[in-house]
A protein has these predicted regions:
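NAD(P)+-binding Rossmann beta1-loop-alpha1 motif at the extreme N-terminus of oxidoreductases
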Residues: 2-59, 63-66, 70
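Phosphate-coordination loops involved in phosphoryl transfer and adenosine-cofactor binding
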Residues: 6-9, 94, 147
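Rossmann-like NAD(P)-binding element
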Residues: 61-91, 95-98, 102
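Rossmann-like NAD(P)(H) cofactor-binding subdomain of soluble oxidoreductases
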Residues: 86-138
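Internal alpha-helical scaffold of NAD(P)-dependent oxidoreductase catalytic cores
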Residues: 145-165, 174, 185-260
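Interdomain hinge/lid region at the active-site interface
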Residues: 244-311
Length: 320
């Protein structure tokens, strides 16, 4: 039997942008997978109307997951932490459970405690680096994952990383402490994980294995800090609007591109900020220092070096 066939029944918990897009991607790029969706009644009804689910549930969780081969948790971080114990109790022994949360340290640590004594059940941390500034099932897209990186944090590849988190000094700077590369563990060879990796490839994403702390450090700088920078600039400009709509009345495409992330709702970011606040706090301090340095260079040609570095980073970003 092909490893892909180990995953015939998928239960998706949360059918917002990510969960809904994953369901639509399964529909478009795989064959023969039965999709069950669990969420609020109106949301799962919409998912079924869009063809993203064969079977829908709201309310009690057990019926939605008790026959699943893959349980895909696409819920907010706090909700995921609350629901993990119930998933551990009611998921079948053969099931692979994975999440799509934007931070990983707390999720992986909780899952290790819950699933370590649950027989053959397996948890695999995940984070698809895909999204939009708009949320909800109405904005779900079967092609959302194409060309993106899919971060994976497995149990055996994150233990040492999380031990480092537990035993590090409280005063340690999360940005100056070196990020740790995690050893490869046997979780990669588990047939269920192999099957899930095949699904990731079919929906167009590239897997990247790393540790939980390493993940949160990287996304803190590359994803969460840019969001806060966009919020800061947008709220600053909002506070300086005059009766003629200036300065926004003279804004061009550059400002719209820069502030695209400012359209994201706080409800999407609340849990992310709370669970990655140490990295973000340190990152904001260093970023504020960089802004001070730029201000001091305004009257000199020294800004050229900063522009050159920015150009190189932009070129590098386009290569990923």
């Amino acid at each position: 039997m092909s490893p892909t066939h180990l995953i015939n029944r998928v239960s998706i918990l949360g059918t917002g942008l990510i969960g809904g897009s994953f369901a639509l991607a399964l529909r478009k790029y795989t064959e023969g997978i039965h999709i069950t969706a669990w969420d609020r009644r109106d949301t799962v009804a919409r998912a079924k109307d869009l063809g993203a689910a064969d079977e829908i549930f709201s309310g009690e969780l057990k019926p939605a997951i008790e026959n699943a081969d893959l349980i895909y948790v696409a819920l907010p971080i706090s909700t995921t932490l609350d629901i993990l114990p119930e998933i551990a109790r009611h998921s079948p022994q053969h099931a692979l459970v994975t999440d799509a949360c934007s931070t990983k340290v707390r999720i992986v640590r909780a899952a290790e405690e819950l699933f370590s004594g649950s027989g053959e059940k397996l948890f695999l941390g995940g984070h698809p680096m895909a999204g939009k500034e708009l949320s909800g099932i109405a904005n779900a897209d079967a092609n959302l994952f194409r060309g993106t990186t899919y971060a994976l944090v497995g149990e055996s590849s994150s233990n040492a990383d999380d031990e480092a988190v537990r035993h590090s000094s409280p005063e340690a700077d999360p940005l100056t402490s070196p990020a740790r590369s995690m050893p490869t563990g046997t979780i990669k060879e588990d047939p269920r994980v192999v099957a899930f990796l095949k699904i990731i490839a079919k929906i167009g994403a590239r897997p990247l294995w790393l540790g939980a702390q390493q993940h949160d450090y990287a996304v803190g700088l590359a994803s969460h800090l840019p969001q806060l920078a966009a919020v800061a600039l947008a709220s600053f400009l909002y506070d300086h609007l005059d009766e003629n709509g200036l300065p926004i009345a003279l804004a061009g495409p550059g400002l719209r591109d820069t502030l695209r992330l400012a359209g994201s709702p706080y409800s999407t970011w609340r849990d992310i900020v709370l669970t990655n606040r140490e990295v973000l706090s340190a990152g904001l301090d260093l970023f504020a220092r960089r802004l001070d340095e730029l201000r001091d260079k305004l009257a000199s040609r020294e800004l050229e070096a900063d522009f050159d570095a920015a150009n190189e980073l932009y070129k590098l970003l386009r290569s990923f």
